[in-house]
């Protein structure tokens, strides 16, 4: 996978377990663009103690939700200060509501860097439950396995260290169905928004990761 001279400006949409964490690095590698995960950005701004970070921390410490203005401000700051954004960006975890999508579009339009694509990774809930509830993690290294698709050599044991594997508490089926329900409620309007603006593209993410990658390149018109 070689970097090419094209740039890409896109939003990556998909439920937990759809493979965003697999495909985003592929996109970064292919285009040299920046992967902007809003969760990571928020943590980084708070850790650095930037004005936006200080403001966000105050709100989060009180159990509040960080405002759309702060989130869009963070993305704008990242676009202005992160050299990788010169080759474009892959936004992950944002926008989650129509007002966020509108504010994002407005800010990007003002910069002359509008979104080119909103790619939705589509997977049936049943398959996601099978994928996610089988996930096992080696806590200290972050190595992950899967009971069905990528089992460890010895049951519940890390291949490298022989230490026990754990199943994340939010990876049980009931908790997951709740997350999926709220994801659908939140995301369906966003998908409709991007369909209206004409930049939406859906990809069948139930395929093998390599095939998903090929499909993404196809909808981006880059294959």
Curated annotation (Swiss-Prot):
Return the annotated region ranges for NMP.
37-66
The record's InterPro entries line, in alphabetical order, gives:
Adenyl_kin_sub, Adenylat/UMP-CMP_kin, Adenylat_kinase_CS, Adenylate_kinase_lid-dom, ADK_active_lid_dom_sf, AK2, P-loop_NTPase
Keyword ATP-binding attributed: yes
Which source organism? Vanderwaltozyma polyspora (strain ATCC 22028 / DSM 70294 / BCRC 21397 / CBS 2163 / NBRC 10782 / NRRL Y-8283 / UCD 57-17)
Q: Which CDD domains match?
A: ADK
**Which gene holds the coding sequence for this protein?**
ADK1
Any one cellular component term from GO for this entry? mitochondrial intermembrane space
Q: Name one GO molecular function term.
A: DNA replication origin binding
List of residues binding AMP: 38, 43, 64-66, 93-96, 100, 168, 179
Q: Does the keyword Transcription apply?
A: no
Q: Name one GO biological process term.
A: ADP biosynthetic process
**Subunit details for this protein?**
Monomer.
Keyword annotations for this protein, in alphabetical order, are: ATP-binding, Cytoplasm, Kinase, Mitochondrion, Nucleotide-binding, Transferase
Q: Primary place of residence? A: cytoplasm
- Residues involved in ATP binding: 17-22, 135, 144-145, 207
Q: What is this protein called?
A: Adenylate kinase
Free-text comment about domains: Consists of three domains, a large central CORE domain and two small peripheral domains, NMPbind and LID, which undergo movements during catalysis. The LID domain closes over the site of phosphoryl transfer upon ATP binding. Assembling and dissambling the active center during each catalytic cycle provides an effective means to prevent ATP hydrolysis.
